[in-house]
Structure formats: structure tokens, C-alpha cells
């Protein structure tokens, strides 16, 4: 008999060879219609898996995230089968699941068009209607290579060559289609009913632009048609809010092929950038941070000492100067340690909170670049706190409180915190890990935040917190981080003299609130759909004239507003007033003052706000005072 343990710590005995589906039938009949796969010792497997030894057993249901991921995995296979039946000459490459869906890469001379997606969907529905079983088989390496070679599936052969020699080669069959796959899959194709193919794009084998170009078809799949409809409606909203589109319309920034992954900030976009930077700078000053500036170009030797050369070299931009290899910095932390090391430090100097708006560069494949969200050149609101072990809790709490204050100001109140604790392989003593982990937990609790545990997912040099924002349409954006580091100060020779007169390495806290300014601006644009809060809007006030007689009054009001640091502009063109109003609303100007004969006579303005069609008259002095009350923070 074998012992099978369950999540409630109970144990049942079964004959070896019992299938996962039989255990569910016997013990969990209420889950029969919801079960899609099982977990044996935390490994996801098919329902038909035979259990031959003692294990921990869990049921994966359709209503779980893992269950939904399996539905999407199934649908990717069904799409590949449909395409192979419609276009036999097409070669399959890889088809993973991704956030909210899946994709599959194909090698073919045929150019897939968006119009063909509906026909592919029809073929997929035919396959689903047949209710074909997903059948798992284990093949020898030789069998797999021979089969896929005979089929001309060269990319599958390349994938097999990279599978470790000790691992089984598994394939899945559904109907006439056979694909290389680890699984798991649902019992049959019938579960994948709510899906939609969304777009076609180019890609490269292994993401390397030097390799042959492939074609990638994206899709999404959900449990029900209702969920699918909700998601597709959300996609329309996402498209409306696309920061690249809004950024162009509002003349904030642009990107061009001569500088891929780098931003050309226009006047209005740079205003937003500077407001955010200066706001964060002031918050840091008020919280005891010093600001520094470090070089962009540093010798390879520093990156070797820090350990980044071995782990991060492929993402560095390298050059050679005076016969020495140099790199544009991809991060600021080793530079901050150099400033710490520039003088003798005492325990009385700690904590030392060192901040930098550090511009960094990292290589990203061109296909991965995405507007402001994924770039090669970016500025971090970076800071490092050098402290003693006894100061960790207080510093972590102060950071969490600061971070929450900032997020609330920018309009984010729904924050998810992920806590990653010690991995098996790690540096530092259990004592310091205990203290660091307790500090992070305590700081999150004191800030009235809940956290999700990522067990064992911390870096080898310390535990971390990740702060994820939920935007106006429910998307999640990971921005803030608090990462403990027990290793880098030691590697780079940082120490302070303790109260005992001995040398000690400081604990280093890597922390950021926004992440990068570029990406955070992209998130803000999409969160607010371009309608930024008044204090953040590049133009806060537009003064529109109805007649020529109003020009002098309008200009005088503009000067009056600008003296109070209001970012104002005046429109004295000959266009009709309704056209002017529409034009400035399309520019997302939060406040319009409309000036005509009546307003001149009464020294007033007619006010219209971006989110309202109503207009009301107010004296110019009162209108300015009202605007000033919300024009800055």
C-alpha cells in the first residue's frame, strides 16, 4: 500500500498504480466536474497519472489560476493542430502560456493575416467539438528525434537536444496532432470553449534577431464565454488607454528607430517627468536621504568585484577605452558602495540613506521593447540604505510608510505586496535571515498591508518585498521593491566601526518606489487615461477667447496665473469657441477659462472642467484661488 497525504494533513492508503482521477472519484466526488489536473509532491500532472509511491496529493480545479493556465495550454495545442491541418507545410516551434493567454510560434513562408484568424478559430471549434483526448506518451530521445526529423519539425529537434539527458521526453497526442510537451493537459479538448485569437506578430527563435524570423499568433482563453467577453471588452479599454497612443496625441514623447528603447521627451512630457522627479526628491529630503550622482561608465573590474559581470554581462552595453573594457552601468548599487567606502564610517553615521535618480542602460531585445514600459535607457528612483542589523526593522517600516504615501498621491490605493523569503542556497547566517524576514513582515503589517508569500523566492543575498499597483482597469504593475543585501557590502569591502570598536559590514537595503520614472509615467498615463491630476498636468489651464476684444484680458489672466506658478496657455485664434473647447478637451487640459464680453465686463471667467460639460461663472480672483488649491501638492 502507498500513503497519500492531503492538504488537511490527513492520510489515506491505496494500492500502487491508482490514478489521480480515481482518488478524486473516491474521496472528492464534488470536484469531479471541476478537476482538470492534480499535483503530486507539488508537481502538476494529468488526472490519469498513476501514483506508485507515497506522496502529497492536491486537486487542480478549473476555478484556480493553475486550472486556467492549463485551459490556455490546451488551447495553444488546439490552435497548433488547427494550423497544421489548414497549412500542412507550417512548422511548429513553441507555444507557452502567458499572462491572460498564450501564443504559438510558427516557421513558414506563408504570411498569416489578421483576417485568417477567424478561419483558424472555426477549425479549432471543429477540433473541440470532436472532444479529442489529450494522450501523454513517454518516448526515448531517439524515438522523438526520429519522429520530428521525419516530419521536418527541425525546431522540435533543437528543443529535444537541449533537454537534459536524464529527463524523459514526453509528447501529447490529440487526434492526428503530436506535440513535444511536458504537460499537464486536461483529459480532452472539450474544456477549451471560450477563446479568441487576438493578433499576429513577428518573433525570432530564442528571441535572437540573428536567427530566422518566425510568426507568432496570440490568443486568450477563459473558463466561460462571460469571462472571455469581459476580457475582450477590457482589451478595447486597454487600447484606448495605450500610453504610446496618448503620448503621441498629447505631444509628450516619441521613439524612433535610430534610438530604439530610448525616449525623446518633448516639452510637455519632460514637465511631467520633472514634476515627478522633484516630488520624489522632496519626499526623500524630508525622510533623511542624501542625494548623490555617480558615473555612467565604469570599468569591468568593478562589475567583476560586485558579481554583476558573471550574472548580468549579457544585458550590459560594453566598450573599450584605453585598451580596457568598460560598461555603461545597468544599476547604481556598486557605485553607491564606492561613496560609502570613500571615508571611514562609524555606527554613529548609520543609517545612511543614499538616493540617486540614476540613469541606467540595459540591453533588451528589440522585440521586447514597449513604449515607456520596456526600454534600454531609464532612470530609477534608486536608493540604498546602509544600516546595522538592529536598524533593519525601523528602516523597513519607514520605507513602507513613505511608499504608501507616494502611491496614494498618484492615485493608487490597491496595493499587493509579495514577500520572498530565504532560498535553500543562501549567504548569511540563519540569525540574520530571521531578523531580516521578521523586519519585512513587521514593516508590512505596521503599514496595514497584506502580503502574499513567495516561499524560497528571495535572492541568495537576502529576502525582499515587491509592491504591485492595481490600476483603474484592474491590471497589476510591479513597481516598488525593498531588497535586503548581506553580500554586496562584503564583496566591495564596505565596513563601519561598531560600538565595540570592531569592523562590521553594513546591511544594505536596495529600495525603489516608482521603479523607473519612464515606466511609471507610462503606468500613470494609462491609469488616468491621459487625464492626469491637475498638479501633474503639463498644462493646467487653458484660457479661450470668444472675441478679439477678450485677447488683452485673456493674456493678462495668463500672466497672473503664471506668476502663481500655474502652467497656463491662452488660445486667441479666430476659431469658433465650441471648436476651441473640443480641441482643448482632446488635449486633456483639466481646466478651461472661457472669456467673452460678459466676463470682461465683470472681471470674471466662465469655468469648464475636463470631466464636466457644465460651465459656471466665477470672479477671476476666486477662480485663480480655487485652481491654486489643487494645482500643487
Swiss-Prot record:
GO molecular function: ATP binding; metal ion binding; threonine-tRNA ligase activity; tRNA binding
EC code: 6.1.1.3
GO biological process assignments: threonyl-tRNA aminoacylation
Origin superkingdom: Bacteria
The keyword Metal-binding is annotated on this UniProt entry: yes
A UniProt-annotated Pfam family: tRNA_SAD
Name listed for the protein in its UniProt record: Threonine--tRNA ligase
PROSITE patterns, per database record: AA_TRNA_LIGASE_II, TGS
Task performed by this protein: Catalyzes the attachment of threonine to tRNA(Thr) in a two-step reaction: L-threonine is first activated by ATP to form Thr-AMP and then transferred to the acceptor end of tRNA(Thr). Also edits incorrectly charged L-seryl-tRNA(Thr).
Organism, as annotated: Ehrlichia ruminantium (strain Gardel)
Co-factor note (free text): Binds 1 zinc ion per subunit.
Amino acid at each position: 500500500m502507498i500513503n497519500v497525504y492531503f492538504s488537511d494533513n490527513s492520510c489515506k492508503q491505496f494500492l500502487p498504480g491508482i490514478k489521480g482521477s480515481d482518488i478524486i472519484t473516491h474521496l472528492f466526488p464534488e470536484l469531479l466536474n471541476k478537476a482538470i489536473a492534480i499535483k503530486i509532491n507539488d508537481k502538476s500532472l494529468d488526472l490519469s497519472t498513476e501514483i506508485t509511491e507515497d506522496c502529497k496529493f492536491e486537486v487542480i480545479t478549473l476555478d484556480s489560476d493553475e486550472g486556467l493556465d492549463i485551459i490556455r495550454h490546451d488551447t495553444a495545442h488546439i490552435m497548433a493542430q488547427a494550423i497544421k491541418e489548414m497549412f500542412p507545410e507550417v512548422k511548429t516551434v513553441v507555444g507557452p502560456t502567458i499572462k491572460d493567454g498564450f501564443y504559438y510560434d510558427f516557421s513558414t513562408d506563408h504570411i498569416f493575416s489578421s483576417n485568417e484568424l477567424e478561419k483558424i478559430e472555426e477549425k479549432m471549434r471543429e477540433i473541440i467539438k470532436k472532444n479529442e483526448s489529450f494522450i501523454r506518451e513517454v518516448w526515448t530521445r531517439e524515438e522523438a528525434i526520429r519522429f520530428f526529423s521525419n516530419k521536418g519539425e527541425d525546431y522540435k529537434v533543437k528543443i529535444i537536444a537541449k533537454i537534459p539527458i536524464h529527463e524523459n521526453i514526453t509528447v501529447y497526442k490529440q487526434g492526428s496532432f503530436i506535440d513535444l510537451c511536458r504537460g499537464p493537459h486536461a483529459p480532452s479538448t472539450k474544456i477549451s470553449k471560450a477563446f479568441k485569437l487576438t493578433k499576429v506578430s513577428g518573433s525570432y527563435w530564442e528571441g535572437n534577431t540573428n536567427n530566422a524570423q518566425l510568426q507568432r499568433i496570440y490568443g486568450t482563453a477563459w473558463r466561460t464565454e462571460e469571462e472571455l467577453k469581459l476580457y475582450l471588452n477590457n482589451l478595447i479599454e486597454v487600447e484606448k488607454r495605450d500610453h504610446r497612443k496618448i503620448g503621441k496625441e498629447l505631444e509628450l514623447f516619441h521613439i524612433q528607430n535610430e534610438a530604439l528603447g530610448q525616449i525623446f521627451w518633448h516639452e510637455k512630457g519632460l514637465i511631467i517627468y520633472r514634476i515627478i522627479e522633484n516630488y520624489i526628491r522632496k519626499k526623500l529630503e524630508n525622510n533623511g536621504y542624501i542625494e548623490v550622482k555617480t558615473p555612467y561608465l565604469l570599468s569591468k573590474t568593478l562589475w567583476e568585484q560586485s558579481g554583476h559581470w558573471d550574472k548580468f554581462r549579457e544585458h550590459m552595453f560594453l566598450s573599450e577605452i584605453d585598451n580596457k573594457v568598460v560598461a555603461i552601468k545597468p544599476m547604481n548599487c556598486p557605485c553607491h558602495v564606492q561613496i560609502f567606502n570613500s571615508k571611514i564610517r562609524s555606527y554613529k553615521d548609520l543609517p545612511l540613506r543614499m538616493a540617486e535618480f540614476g540613469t541606467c542602460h540595459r540591453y533588451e531585445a528589440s522585440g521586447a521593447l514597449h513604449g515607456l514600459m520596456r526600454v534600454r535607457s531609464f532612470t530609477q528612483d534608486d536608493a540604498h540604505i546602509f544600516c546595522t542589523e538592529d536598524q533593519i526593522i525601523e528602516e523597513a517600516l519607514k520605507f513602507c510608510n513613505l511608499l504608501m504615501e507616494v502611491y496614494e498621491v498618484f492615485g493608487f490605493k490597491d496595493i499587493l505586496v509579495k514577500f520572498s523569503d530565504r532560498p535553500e542556497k543562501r549567504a548569511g547566517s540563519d540569525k540574520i535571515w530571521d531578523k531580516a524576514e521578521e523586519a519585512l513582515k513587521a514593516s508590512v503589517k505596521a503599514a496595514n498591508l497584506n502580503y502574499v508569500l513567495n516561499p524560497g523566492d528571495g535572492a541568495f543575498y537576502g529576502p525582499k518585498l515587491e509592491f504591485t499597483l492595481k490600476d483603474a482597469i484592474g491590471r497589476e504593475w510591479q513597481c516598488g521593491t525593498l531588497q535586503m543585501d548581506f553580500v554586496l557590502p562584503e564583496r566591495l569591502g564596505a565596513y563601519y566601526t561598531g560600538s565595540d570598536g570592531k569592523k562590521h559590514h553594513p546591511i544594505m537595503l536596495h529600495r525603489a518606489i516608482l521603479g523607473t520614472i519612464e515606466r511609471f509615467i507610462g503606468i500613470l498615463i494609462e491609469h488616468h487615461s491621459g487625464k492626469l491630476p491637475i498638479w501633474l498636468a503639463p498644462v493646467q489651464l487653458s484660457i479661450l477667447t470668444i472675441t478679439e476684444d477678450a485677447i488683452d484680458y485673456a493674456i493678462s489672466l495668463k500672466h497672473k496665473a503664471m506668476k502663481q506658478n500655474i502652467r497656463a496657455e491662452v488660445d486667441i485664434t479666430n476659431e469658433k469657441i465650441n471648436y476651441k473647447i473640443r480641441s482643448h478637451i482632446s488635449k486633456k487640459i483639466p481646466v478651461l477659462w472661457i472669456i467673452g464680453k460678459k466676463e470682461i465686463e465683470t472681471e470674471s471667467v466662465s469655468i469648464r472642467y475636463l470631466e464636466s460639460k457644465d460651465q459656471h461663472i466665477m470672479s477671476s480672483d476666486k477662480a485663480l484661488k480655487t485652481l491654486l488649491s489643487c494645482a500643487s501638492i
